[in-house]
Amino acid sequence: MTTNLDSTQLEKLTDTDINDTVLKLKKELFELRLQKATRQEIKPHLFKQKKKLIAKLLTIKSKKS
């Protein structure tokens, strides 16, 4: 969903949307870590991608308040 949004679209999100998205991304990161720990096949680039998106969203949220 939000992985295809650019920064202008991310800035238009409300605080609740940002919080929901960050929570969802953190859950996905946790699931990726579990898959890695159990030696399932994963796509390593997703770790970096999700972490960067979380950082972007939290930065936008802090700028708004």
Curated annotation (Swiss-Prot):
Name of the encoding gene: rpl29
HAMAP family xref list: Ribosomal_uL29
Name of this protein: Large ribosomal subunit protein uL29c
InterPro entries found in the cross-reference section: Ribosomal_protein_uL29, Ribosomal_uL29, Ribosomal_uL29_sf
Cited SUPFAM superfamilies: Ribosomal protein L29 (L29p)
Annotated Gene Ontology cellular component terms: chloroplast; cytosolic large ribosomal subunit
GO biological process, one term: translation
Natural source organism: Guillardia theta (Cryptophyte)
Taxon lineage: Eukaryota, Cryptophyceae, Pyrenomonadales, Geminigeraceae, Guillardia
Keywords: Chloroplast, Plastid, Ribonucleoprotein, Ribosomal protein
GO MF, any single term: structural constituent of ribosome
Keyword Ligase: no
Statement: the UniProt record of this protein carries the keyword Transcription regulation: no
Primary localization class, coarse: plastid
Family in the record: Belongs to the universal ribosomal protein uL29 family.
